[in-house]
């Protein structure tokens, strides 16, 4: 199987952490769309949003998604990548989409443990727990709609990777 694997989900679900280890375990290349975009522009996500507003960032995010999609690649996407209909169809049609889902409490704990406010601008201006709850309520249906595989991401990364590998084996054998 050489199809790209797209990891989707909200901030804090482990897309980058799991993605790097998953790519290593599958002997694949790893790319994080936010990190790729930041390296191309030499700006943080917050700086891009400040300069170009969210609409400009979303357009650049789509371009990044297209640029990094390649065979034998694990791609960690930004949490809002699914907001653009093109991106949802692109990922569904060009690879296997894995939704790393986790409850709000887990997401908030992870985000508080590794705060990166300069890299992750607020979406609502509300306190973190309220923002995570609101954003997840808005996006969960889109994550589920686009996903080929849904994985509980509350476990340790090694367990999450094991579950992804198992689900991939079943997907390939169908």
UniProtKB/Swiss-Prot annotation:
One of its GO terms (biological process) is aromatic amino acid family biosynthetic process. SUPFAM superfamilies: P-loop containing nucleoside triphosphate hydrolases (SSF52540). Mg(2+) binds at residues 16, 32. GO terms for molecular function: ATP binding; magnesium ion binding; metal ion binding; shikimate kinase activity. It comes from the Bacteria. Substrate binds at residues 34, 58, 79, 139. Its EC number is 2.7.1.71. Pathway: Metabolic intermediate biosynthesis; chorismate biosynthesis; chorismate from D-erythrose 4-phosphate and phosphoenolpyruvate: step 5/7. Residues 112-126 are annotated as: LID domain. Keywords: Amino-acid biosynthesis, Aromatic amino acid biosynthesis, ATP-binding, Cytoplasm, Kinase, Magnesium, Metal-binding, Nucleotide-binding, Transferase. It is found in: Cytoplasm. Its cofactor is Mg(2+). It catalyses: shikimate + ATP = 3-phosphoshikimate + ADP + H(+). It holds the Pfam family SKI. InterPro entries: P-loop_NTPase, Shikimate/glucono_kinase, Shikimate_kinase/TSH1, Shikimate_kinase_2, Shikimate_kinase_CS. Binds 1 Mg(2+) ion per subunit. Its main location: cytoplasm. ATP binds at residues 12-17, 120. The keyword Transferase applies. The keyword Kinase applies. Catalyzes the specific phosphorylation of the 3-hydroxyl group of shikimic acid using ATP as a cosubstrate. Two isozymes have been found in E.coli. AroK has 100-fold lower affinity for shikimate than AroL, suggesting that AroL is the dominant enzyme in the biosynthesis of the aromatic amino acids, with AroK playing a secondary role and possibly participating in an as yet unidentified cellular process. This is Shikimate kinase 2. It comes from Escherichia coli (strain K12). The gene is aroL.
